[in-house]
A protein has these predicted regions:
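Carbohydrate-interacting regions of secretory-pathway proteins
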Residues: 129
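Compositionally biased, low-complexity/repeat regions
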Residues: 43-45, 49-54, 135, 139-186
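Active-site loops and adjacent core secondary-structure elements that bind or stabilize anionic groups
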Residues: 1-120, 124, 145, 154
Length: 186
């Protein structure tokens, strides 16, 4: 589930093969193999009844404000907001939305920070592992827990291209740029 393209992008090694890129991959694989039995990724998810109210989404007992897109695409298209994808409260019927959180054991980065390079390698791998954990969890939610795509059978490349039904927006990215949402969700 690891998207290696983004790993290399973090290291500004997108595109063509090079000795440095090959060496980085060897170091990453070695660190993963050495760490596999000592560290774990963790994930939690909740599926909630939800409705929208303006730019906010109300998850049962919690109101979360979302920002509308700040960059204007075209004059004919409105600036969208995450709340636009949830049924409005005034319709009188509920919709559903899920929240995910993923992380990697803190020791993974701390224990591998003996020098700058290893620390950066561990941090960039931890980011990719957390993202891969979210991808795996999202797949399980679609196929089993929520079950709206039980027969889905996507390749890793199709997963990375988001060829699945539904969306998996992430805090800090363009669809949800406000990092303070983390404190509300927590």
């Amino acid at each position: 589930y690891i998207n290696w393209l983004y790993f290399f992008h973090t290291w500004q090694m997108s595109g063509v093969y090079s000795e440095a890129r090959s060496s980085l991959m060897e170091d990453a694989m070695k660190l993963l193999q050495e760490s596999e039995s000592r560290y774990k990724s963790h994930a939690i998810f909740c599926l909630y009844k939800a409705v929208s109210d303006g730019d906010d989404i109300i998850f049962e007992d919690r109101r979360i404000p979302f920002l509308r897109q700040q960059h204007r695409g075209s004059q004919s298209q409105p600036n969208i907001c995450m709340s636009d994808f949830i049924k409005p409260a005034e319709l009188g019927s509920e919709d559903y939305a899920g929240l995910f959180a993923t992380t990697v054991d803190m020791g993974f980065v701390e224990d591998n920070s003996e020098d700058g390079y290893m620390g950066m390698l561990a941090q960039s791998l931890a980011d990719r592992i957390a993202e891969a954990t979210a991808e795996l969890l999202h797949e399980r939610v679609r196929k089993t827990h929520w079950g709206y795509a039980p027969n889905e059978n996507l390749t890793p490349l199709e997963l990375h291209r988001c060829a699945y039904q539904g969306i998996r927006p992430a805090v800090g990215y363009p669809s949800m740029p406000d990092l303070s949402i983390n404190f509300i969700i927590n």
